Amino acid sequence: MGKTAIALNICLNVAKTYEKTVAFFSLEMSREQLVMRLLSTESFVENQKLTTGHLDEEDWGKLSIASSALSQTDIRVDDNPAITVAEINAKCRRLDNLGLVLIDYLQLMTAAAPGKSGDNRVTVVSDISRALKIMAKELNVPVICLSQLSRANESRTDKRPMLSDLRESGAIEQDADSVMFLYRDEYYNPNTQDKNIAECIVAKNRHGETGTVKLQWRPQFFTFSDLEWKHEG
């Protein structure tokens, strides 16, 4: 659906626009895979070209400019697949000018003390969710945590996700200040007229309004943008 892609888009925006340090903890993808995606997003060179190495002179020029721009940002990527909240907290406390923490994704995280909550994943995920909430308050920075959904929406006519679809949700809905879902109609309906259109559904917003924003999705660059936005170059 594009949850890692939109997380990287947010990561880039915070690092470039606000010149803040961003900590990205990836439990699913490797550092190398994420860097390739960042390069594709920043350079507008198709990711397939990067992975196959089939690059022309124009591509190399774009990559050079993108690499220079990325080198001016402070994006820290940690791809430890077994990291705990306590370890994330400790790493973040050592970072200066921290502006955002991103975690991809919640259900892959392990409890600090394995076996403490038994084999009940709902309880484990709820404990992790609560610990992340406390960490965000202590660090005084926003923490964006990606999450899997259950497959309950697949049995509905309208497959747009709802809060009740949060997998192993427990306290996720309660702890989060904001909950946003991504929905792309073509994922379920290949013949839809909304090709490469994504809906960002703000299902919960403790400090503002809820609603839906439509975005343009460019899968070849792993990029989301405003519908009216056009890349020059």
Segments (PLM) and residue ranges:
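Conserved lysine of the Walker
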Residues: 3-4
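Cytosolic-facing regulatory segments adjacent to core modules
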Residues: 7-9, 13-97, 111, 212-216
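Flexible beta-alpha connector loops of hexameric P-loop NTPases
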Residues: 47-57, 75-81, 110-126, 153-164
